[in-house]
Structure formats: C-alpha cells, structure tokens
Amino acid sequence: MPHHEFECSKVIPERKKHAVIKGKGETLADALPQGYLNTIPGSISERGCAYCGAKHVIGTPMKDVIHISHGPVGCTYDTWQTKRYISDNDNFQLKYTYATDVKEKHIVFGAEKLLKQNIIEAFKAFPQIKRMTIYQTCATALIGDDINAIAEEVMEEMPEVDIFVCNSPGFAGPSQSGGHHKINIAWINQKVGTVEPEITGDHVINYVGEYNIQGDQEVMVDYFKRMGIQVLSTFTGNGSYDGLRAMHRAHLNVLECARSAEYICNELRVRYGIPRLDIDGFGFKPLADSLRKIGMFFGIEDRAKAIIDEEVARWKPELDWYKERLMGKKVCLWPGGSKLWHWAHVIEEEMGLKVVSVYIKFGHQGDMEKGIARCGEGTLAIDDPNELEGLEALEMLKPDIILTGKRPGEVAKKVRVPYLNAHAYHNGPYKGFEGWVRFARDIYNAIYSPIHQLSGIDITKDNAPEWGNGFRTRQMLSDGNLSDAVRNSETLRQYTGGYDSVSKLREREYPAFERKVG
C-alpha cells in the first residue's frame, strides 16, 4: 500500500504520509494514511473546528432549545442552517440561532455581563422555550469568561429554565471530532439522570448518533415503533432536551454514528450498565441485519422479520432498476466521517457502483481502517485533503460522481464532475429501505443529468451536438447499452415514492403490543 504524493503538495512533504493507494492483496497492516492529526500549516484544510463539531453537528439538532454561541457573530453564522436536520416542531432550531456578538471591547474588558444579558433576552423573545445550550468559542475561552457561572446565575433567577453549557472552543481538538467528544461527555456529566421519564413499553432504547438529516431519524423511529419499541430519546436529531436528560433509563443504546457519539454510549454503559448495539440504517442488507439484531436483543425477531419482508418486497424492484443503470460507474466517496465505511461496500454490492477513492476530514484511524478494508484494489485513500489535492485526485481518477459535502462538491462541479451532498443530502431521507432507493435515484439523476453532457461543449466554437428533434433525457443516456430484457423489464421500476416521505410518518398509528406482567 504505497503512499501517494500529490504533485500540488510536494512543497509540503509531510502530506505524503496522508494518502495511500491500496495494492493487490495488501492488508491494513501494510500502510494506512496518517489521520486525526493537526492540519499541516500551508495545507488549506476543509475541516471544521471543535466548536463546529459540538454545536453544528450534535447540539443544534435538539429541537426545543435556544442555541446561543458566546463569541463573534461569524462563529454562529458559520454553523447556522447549513445542515437540514429537520424536526417535528416546525424546525424551530433551524430557524433561530443566537450569538452574543462579542466585539473588541469585550475581549479587553470581558463579556460575561454581555452573555447574561443575551441569555435573558433570548428567553424573553421565545417565552415558550425553557431550555438553552450555550457554546464557548475561541475568543471567549481565551479571555477566561466563566460561562458555567453565568448559566448558574440565570437558573437561580429563572428557576423554570434549564441551561446546558458546552465548553468546546474551536482549538479544543484537531478537527470537529474533538467537539463531538466534548459535548458527549459534557451532556452526561451535566444532564443525564436529572429527569425521570415515563416508561410505556417493555423494550426501551436510546437512539444515539442520529441527527435527522431530512428525516432520517423519523424513518428509523418508524421501524422501531412498528416493532413495539419505545424510543426514550434520540441523541440528538429531532430529540428533546428533557428526553435526553432521561437517557439513563433505557434498556439499550442503539448507536448509528460511532464517530460522533460512541463516547456517550460508552459512558452510559460504564455508569448505568446500558449495553451498546451498533447499527447501520443505510442499505437493504445492513439495515435488515440491524433490525434483526435489535429484535434478537429483545426477543422480538418475528416483528423485525415482518417489517423487513414487507419493505424489501415493496422497494427492491426499484433499487434494482437503478442498479442496472449505475453498474460500473466510478464514485469518489468523500463524506468525511463514518459514512466512509457505512457506504463503501454497500453501494458497490447494492447499486453496482465502483468506489475509486475514500477520504476522511475528521475521522480517526479506525474509520479509515474500516473504509479501506471494504474497498477494492487501486482505491486512493486520503486523510484531510486540501482543495488542490481533491482536484488532482479527480483528474487522476476521472470519477462519474463524488459523494461529499458542499465545499468540495461545488469545486467538483466547476470541473464538470457531478456531486451528491453526502452531509445534508439533496432529496433525502436516505436511511431506510425507501430512503436507500431515493439515494440511488439521486445518484442516477446526477450522473445522467443532460446538463453534464452539455457542460463540456465550447459554444463559442459552434459545435453543439445534433440531437435530432429533441433534448436527450436521462433515460435516453442511461439505457443505450442495456439489454432488451432489462430495458423492457416489467418487474423493475423507477422510484414511485412521493416527494415528502416523512410527513406521513408523523400521522401514523402503531400497533399496541401487550406488555409483560411483572
């Protein structure tokens, strides 16, 4: 597994150890990219900071909370509305965010009075909201503002409110992953065990590491409820503040994103004896295996099987329609964290795509190990790439699509490579059986968009293609080399779900399973 040196990074020789190409028959012991280290000076990283990891990734998806950042307004703006973590309370946490808007004079004279004033103003502006999270930033951490003391003062003066303090300034780790750890531990130290919940079922879980991107959480909770499982809390997408204070009463922690939330799961196991079960909501087989594991834990395998059989029968013909048309298409899998290994194997097995590159921005060595292990020979693996390295990789690999975030994705579009937003999605949710078909549909739509066929044409030279009497459609582009049997199949079909697959779940009624006596 030789290290790969990018031409653009030869002036930063340390970068060579951060990229490898997987060779034939090589094992993980041969070489791995160095990872989760401080970004090398001179390499323009696309990472987020520890503050971003705490507030943007984990904190803000809590739905019934005023989120206030104690620092310059730029920190707040950078973490506002850039992910579609929706909620069933009209997306309150997406619409509003607060900043103390620290200026130079506050750096000189202190900003604790400013913070207290802002906290009180925020609660007055939203009298129906009684919960708040305060996030420390670099500027106010460096001047030593005691935000814990201010929060305690306000709670004494306003006993009906409750405030959580997250001390995770931007410099508190090499990347946003440092912030994940900070907020995990802060929450269990400050808030878990401070509310006693109503237990309504025999099977009670915390759903951990799920952020409800475009409804992912609501899709998965639908499966759990159909199995007769009470979801006590979700950490943190569409989750309630007080629900998360009651995490100590669950029977099982069901963990989705291990990179961002394994820390609180491990602490809940140590402090309260709650076991951890890792699952995967992406892909038919991983999801089916996950539901079976949960069913086995609670002794309700039959309920899991019934859901799996129903969902696979409904959606598999649609997934296979896209698989036939995506077979062999090359993809750069550049999502940043755990999606690297959640997706690496299953998009090849279930969609026919070929992964030619993986990368992490804030992941750890364990993420890269699992990702590389699930990729084939010749895969380029990169840790913390900069923009120029990304462009050079695209030129070398010539992928048909990249699955990544907005920043590298918009750069890719400039060199005529379509991308799909792996962070906030394009038309999600992508979890669940139907969601996985939506994902395949969006990949198909991106690769075969007619606009990409036109983007390489220099219209100044008057060489527009002659396409007869009409514009080419996606299916005209995708079906040219398919066999007649596939093209005319009566069993395979395109996605038939609606634009909004989440709202209907909020109105669904669930079966009432008889509780065990004693």
UniProtKB/Swiss-Prot annotation:
Keyword Signal: no
Keywords: ATP-binding, Iron, Iron-sulfur, Metal-binding, Nitrogen fixation, Nucleotide-binding, Oxidoreductase
Binding site for [8Fe-9S-C-homocitryl] cluster: C257, H423
InterPro entries tied to this protein: Nase/OxRdtase_comp1, Nase_asu, Nase_comp1_asu, Nase_comp1_CS, Nase_Fe-Fe_asu
Group of enzyme by EC: oxidoreductase
PROSITE patterns reported for this sequence: NITROGENASE_1_1 (PS00699), NITROGENASE_1_2 (PS00090)
Cofactor note: Binds 1 [8Fe-7S] cluster per heterodimer.
Binding site for [8Fe-7S] cluster: C49, C75, C138
EC number per UniProt: 1.18.6.1
Cofactor: [8Fe-7S] cluster; [8Fe-9S-C-homocitryl] cluster
Classification via Gene3D superfamilies: Nitrogenase molybdenum iron protein domain
Record GO terms (molecular function): ATP binding; iron-sulfur cluster binding; metal ion binding; nitrogenase activity
Family as reported in the entry's similarity comment: Belongs to the NifD/NifK/NifE/NifN family.
Assembly: Hexamer of two alpha, two beta, and two delta chains.
Other remarks on this protein: The structure of the 8Fe-9S-C-homocitryl cluster is assumed to be analogous to the 7Fe-Mo-9S-C-homocitryl cluster.
Protein name, as recorded: Nitrogenase iron-iron protein alpha chain
Originating species: Azotobacter vinelandii
Gene name of this polypeptide: anfD
